[in-house]
């Protein structure tokens, strides 16, 4: 059986967040993590996996970027298609499955947080995660509602084939 991982494209922190600010592409970090988790155990695949996970250590703007994120963005620019680029990276890793973005446009996580008797709206995966962790547990402090924006994000056309082959075990 072929594994298909449909992965979020809402990451806005770290290397992915910086890439999102500088280029009009999907955030590659979560997609990279899914790709390396599906790689083969051969020396070739494990070497590529380690290279994909390598964080650059520089005194410049590339500091702490995951090299794999930059490679993925390069493939996207080369092929002008994120799914094709991910398939090529999967071939380099000899992946045991396919990684697909859940949307063909970058998504944003938004939430409504209840603090005491008032609510506030927050936006961004990193902000929502931090807000949830900072809330003092209690009946009046909670993450009241979370949503993804844009609400009607376009799915890549490949999903028709993938959706038809889904089996529940």
What residue spans do the PLM features occupy?
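Glycine-rich nucleotide/cofactor/substrate-binding loop typically near the N-terminus or early
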Residues: 7-80, 91-93, 98
């Amino acid at each position: 059986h072929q594994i298909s991982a449909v992965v979020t494209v809402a990451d806005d922190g770290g290397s992915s967040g910086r890439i999102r600010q500088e280029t009009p592409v999907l955030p590659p970090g979560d997609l990279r993590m899914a790709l390396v988790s599906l790689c083969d155990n051969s020396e070739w695949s494990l070497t590529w996996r380690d290279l994909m996970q390598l964080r650059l250590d520089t005194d410049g703007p590339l500091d702490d970027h995951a090299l794999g994120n930059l490679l993925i963005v390069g493939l996207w620019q080369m092929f002008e298609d994120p799914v094709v680029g991910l398939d090529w990276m999967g071939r380099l890793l000899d992946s045991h499955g396919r990684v697909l973005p859940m949307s063909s446009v970058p998504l944003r996580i938004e939430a409504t947080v209840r603090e005491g008797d008032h609510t506030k709206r927050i936006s961004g995966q990193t902000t929502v995660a931090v807000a949830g962790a900072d809330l003092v547990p209690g009946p009046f402090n909670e993450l009241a509602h979370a949503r993804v924006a844009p609400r009607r994000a376009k799915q890549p056309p490949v999903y028709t084939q993938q959706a038809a082959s889904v089996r529940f075990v």
